[in-house]
């Protein structure tokens, strides 16, 4: 499979997830190509690099992420935001440790677009020293977050404990102006692997995983 390619087969959708799934399916390849070329969706230009801590702005006294910026945490995880200040990508080499949680940020991330059964999901888990703040959080279905996503994190943690390196690239995909991703593309390498492994999750119970 070519690097970054996505294959989806045999998944049946109904109800409120159908529209979001269709929009996501149509846009994933464009999204990946845009990010790999250094662009930010909706601008045609690359993100502006800022120092970690400078990725925030204030809107009516509320902290938000700046649009079209790139920031790197002290742990070495690099993120970009899109033209609407949503986390558009994150990547880095994982390291085991204890990140600090922000329970308030986890409860409110996504605002009005958040669903009742969502968690504040960490793109880089706290067990990998991921930030507990909005710069590393998205609204994520709780069953996905605690199920298939957690299984993947456990696979990475086990590899690190075995002495292997783990590198990840995570791309949330959004529809319209929503701050809630409707799907995720996750690519990762373990050890000295040449090719990226690929996981696709839809932001629904069970992740509707296609492999």
Residue ranges of predicted features:
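Low-complexity, glycine/serine/proline-rich disordered segments
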Residues: 1-89, 99-102, 106, 110-112, ...
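Domain-level detector of nuclease and nuclease-like folds
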Residues: 69-211
């Amino acid at each position: 499979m070519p690097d970054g390619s996505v294959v989806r087969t045999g998944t049946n959708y109904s109800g409120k997830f159908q529209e979001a799934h269709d929009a996501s399916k149509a846009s994933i390849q464009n999204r990946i190509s845009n990010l790999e070329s250094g662009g930010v969706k909706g601008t045609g230009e690359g993100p502006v690099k800022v120092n970690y801590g400078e990725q925030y702005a204030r809107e009516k006294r509320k902290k938000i992420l700046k649009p079209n910026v790139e920031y790197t945490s002290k742990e070495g995880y690099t993120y970009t935001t899109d033209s609407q200040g949503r986390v558009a990508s994150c990547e880095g080499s994982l390291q085991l440790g204890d990140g600090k949680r922000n329970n308030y940020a986890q409860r409110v991330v996504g605002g009005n677009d958040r669903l009742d059964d969502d968690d504040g999901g960490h793109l880089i888990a706290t067990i990998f020293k991921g930030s507990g703040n909005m710069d590393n959080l998205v609204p994520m279905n709780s069953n996905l977050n605690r199920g298939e996503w957690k299984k993947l994190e456990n696979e990475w943690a086990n590899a690190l404990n075995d002495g292997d390196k783990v590198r990840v690239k995570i791309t949330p995909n959004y529809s319209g102006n929503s701050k809630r991703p409707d799907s995720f593309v996750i690519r990762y390498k373990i050890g000295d692997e040449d090719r990226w492994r690929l996981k696709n999750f839809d932001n629904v119970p069970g992740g509707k995983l296609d492999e």
